[in-house]
Amino acid sequence: LPDEVPPQVVITPHAGELASLLTARGEDVDASDVQNEPLHWALRAHELTGATVLLKGAVTIVVGEPADTDRESDAQGGFADDEQHVRVVVSGRAPAWLGTAGAGDVLAGMLGALLAQQDDEDVSAPDVAACAAYLHGYAAAQASQSDQRGFTPPTIYGSDDRHLRTKLGHPIVASDVIGMIPATFAELLS
């Protein structure tokens, strides 16, 4: 990865890969540091590279510049390093079964396809990356027949909508996720 890239470049590391990238840029960090403070290190990677960062994990974190950010005028106004100009999106839809060989390649393919369909000027790489992460996780949930998620909504006292039992589902391989992509799109668009 070059020293600095435009925000339309999306990197999709897991904790170990992000730690390696950051270490190569002079940060003293390892995979456990990234797992313990994923938002901090995703923000740091975005700051150091300029790339949109999609940090894969039980809860996927996407960090990048919104499409309406104008770096040049922001820098003149003193906002170049202002965190309010960074978009953070979190997706926890994926089941644990998604942690399988080749699943990251499926995500990269989905992400590339979605980015390729965007206007160059209006693309919000963080939004597109978050959309890809959600679709990827949802397709995996469908393929594994699982209700698992990276986070669970809180149980509200007195509510009938309790999340005490979830279907664990079954193991999947990357091609199972690929097979569910058309049905996932169809369901979400219906």
Task: Tell me the role of every PLM-derived stretch.
Residues 138-190:
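Charged C-terminal helix
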Residues 1-92, 186:
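Glycine-rich phosphate/dinucleotide-binding loop and adjoining beta-alpha-beta core of small-molecule
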Residues 13-15, 55-57, 64, 92-93, ...:
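Active-site proximal loops enriched in glycine and acidic residues that flank catalytic Cys/His/Asp
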